[in-house]
């Protein structure tokens, strides 16, 4: 008989008001030490950070925290959702993150986000630098032009989950292990109707920060950018261009890695992430 083992991850619901409405926000966390707040990609949820939440060495030094945005994963939309269209905006996204940080009492956390999470951390570095120990952007770009018709993501004559997964399937790196590849796609197959499309409103329209990123001061809040080079949504050149605009940014390009480094190949990703986390850990915290 196989031994049953509990993971160290604790999942709970946090009741709080977000954007003026009551929510039950689903949060998972594990470990102790410096808070590391992890933000999932568009149309997915915090399960993308499962491997980080279970990495024994990481948990010795960092309190890893991941939550499902409203309308995503185990966080249900607010009452009356059936009468509205979901569209994520930069202001709403920022307000949600800052409210969660305050509710959890996080003292100078590191915040790490991928894709839309990699975009919003740039907004945080610009507008709330003093609140964060460091910013880590995965697949971060200042803007992206839509490269397919977003209407296909929410149509009554198209199977939404399989369409979303099909669209992002080409963004997974070719060397990703099969289990990581298919778990990443499964999360997309389970997304609510119209949620991926609504997130991409922020990613392609509202979250455009090209004209402002040069104002980010990395002396106030260090910025680290890690990008896989197998990604046509945020190319390595996009990340390099972003780094040229933000003085003092440190960039790591991950060969063969796609758009979802933390879930498609977590073991490979941790080899690139660890040096960054060690540098952050040994840096003196700002008063």
Task: Show the residue positions of the predicted features.
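Alpha/beta-hydrolase fold catalytic core
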Residues: 1-37, 59-63, 106-107, 274-287
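Conserved HGGG/HGGXW glycine-rich cap/lid loop of the alpha/beta-hydrolase fold
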Residues: 19, 23-79
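Active-site loop/oxyanion-hole signature of alpha/beta-hydrolase fold enzymes
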Residues: 20, 65-112, 271
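Flexible "cap/lid" loop of the alpha/beta hydrolase fold
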Residues: 122-127, 131-163
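Conserved alpha/beta-hydrolase catalytic His-Asp/Glu region
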Residues: 146-147, 160-218
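Short beta-strand/loop motif that positions the catalytic acidic residue
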Residues: 219, 225-227
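Acidic catalytic loop of the alpha/beta-hydrolase fold
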Residues: 229-234
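Catalytic active-site module of serine/aspartate enzymes centered on a nucleophile-bearing elbow/loop
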Residues: 249-287
């Amino acid at each position: 008989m196989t031994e049953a083992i509990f993971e160290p991850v604790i999942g709970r619901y946090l009741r709080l008001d977000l954007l003026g409405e009551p929510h039950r926000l689903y949060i998972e966390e594990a470990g102790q030490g410096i808070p590391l707040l992890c933000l999932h990609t568009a149309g997915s949820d915090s399960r993308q950070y499962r491997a980080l939440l279970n990495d024994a060495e990481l948990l010795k030094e960092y309190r890893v925290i991941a939550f499902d945005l409203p309308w995503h994963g185990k966080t249900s939309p607010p009452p009356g959702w059936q009468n509205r269209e979901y569209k994520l905006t930069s202001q709403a996204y920022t307000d949600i993150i800052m409210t969660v940080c305050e509710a959890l009492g996080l003292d100078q956390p590191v915040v790490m986000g991928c894709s839309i999470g990699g975009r919003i951390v740039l907004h945080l570095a610009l507008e709330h630098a003093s609140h964060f120990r460091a910013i880590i952007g995965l697949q971060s770009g200042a803007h992206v032009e839509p490269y397919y018709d977003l209407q296909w993501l929410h149509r009554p004559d198209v199977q939404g989950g399989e369409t979303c997964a099909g669209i992002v399937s080409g963004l997974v790196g070719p060397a990703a292990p099969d289990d990581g590849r298919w778990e990443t796609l499964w999360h997309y197959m389970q997304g609510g109707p119209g949620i991926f499309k609504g997130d991409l409103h922020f990613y392609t329209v509202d979250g455009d920060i090209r004209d402002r990123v040069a104002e980010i001061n990395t002396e106030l809040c260090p910025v680290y950018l890690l990008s896989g080079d197998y990604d046509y949504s945020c190319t390595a050149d996009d990340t390099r261009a972003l780094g040229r605009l933000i003085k003092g940014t440190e960039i790591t390009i991950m060969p063969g890695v796609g758009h979802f480094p933390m879930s498609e190949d977590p073991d490979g990703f941790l080899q690139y992430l660890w040096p960054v986390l060690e540098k952050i850990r040994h840096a003196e915290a700002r008063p």
